[in-house]
Amino acid sequence: DLYSRKIVAWEVHGQECGELAAELIKRAVLAEGIGRNHRPLVLHADNGAPMRSATLLETLRQLGVKPSHSRPRVSNDNAFVESAFRTCKYRPEYPADGFETIDVARQWVWRFVQWYNTEHRHSGLKFVTPQQRHRNEAPAIMRRRVVVYEQARARQPRRWSKGIRDWSLPSSVWLNPMKTASPELAQAA
């Protein structure tokens, strides 16, 4: 989930195929209680064969999910997912020599997803967990942080050269936000 960074679905298989991807998406929609009123709903993916397969695209159509794919040779089109993969691979317990079996890999990924969603205080989310953001608990947490910071500043004003930290989170998140034209460009048009 781009908004919360929560890993809403995952699986480990010995091969990639559109059928497995379609089943994963169906289970994710069911598990997250996503109905047709949750719109717009977009699945952004790389350009791999499973993500472009007719089976997956038809499943997305049936679920009312719009497919989106990374642009060729644009390295940051899937930056949020790449960041999550980096977090995964840099965990101290990540096996340097690979997993012994697929079952061991599945167990490891399950533990990682639990940690990532419920314990990992994400820097891009101002140090709330993806689960807290997903459950809309972040606004209350941010309000409490503002109070704590304001109290600390009131007790020791000389330690604060500026205002308190900005604890606000954006209300919407975009993979590739539209750039607004500068006034000069708007006038030139």
Where are these regions (language model features)?
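Charged DNA-binding/catalytic regions of mobile-element recombinases
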Residues: 1-189
